[in-house]
Amino acid sequence: MLTIALPTGRSLDNCVKILETAGLPVEKLKDAKRNLVIEEGVYKYLLAKPTDVPYIVEWGGASLGIVGNDVTEESNARLVHIADTGLGKCVMAIAAPEESLERYEIAGNAKNLAGLRVATKYVHLAERTFKELGIQIKILKLNGSIELAPVQGIADCIFDVVQTGATLKANGLAVVKETLDVSLHVVARESAVEINEPLFAKTVMAIKNSL
Ligand code: PRP
């Protein structure tokens, strides 16, 4: 049996599509209801919070995982990258209230932005990204509804994932800078890659060939 960790929420439909296209059984997975562990044929699927998928794979709870590279970049889990599925495309971006956009001419303006208050749930990725931009920031860690922070004036901007842009627009925010292309990636546990059991190898090959 091979265990694969999958993210709950808006990415799950794309994950089902990836597995189905690769020829893996997904009938029960499509009808998971509140079940967190679904066994189908020789596969066991685990349904986890997206941010937990990298750690579940790293700690050996699953041999494979599918998760956005926004999440793997934020985590410090040791994983082997298997493939970029190209599905679930979105971007990491800095966004700010529309009326404040003039402030953010990032190139050459880093000093003026020193002390910028950034709301995000991606603390590590934000630290790295703003460091690369040469901007010293203060981070307000939130766990969701990040857009609230600039709307309420408790942060100057947000650093978050943007898919359709609808949430930004609805809250009077606009993209200042896109910093990372994001999509769903297949990742594996290091030891699973080293051991490379037949079912693991066959599954990895099937997924790669179907992309
Ligand atoms: C994410 C993200 C944005 C939104 C972007 O939140 O944090 O709020 O999606 O998507 P859009 O560009 O299509 O509007 P999510 O829905 O995962 O919920 P959260 O606010 O609880 O993190």
Each predicted region: which residue ranges?
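Domain-level signature for soluble enzymes in the chorismate/prephenate branch of the shikimate pathway
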Residues: M1-L211
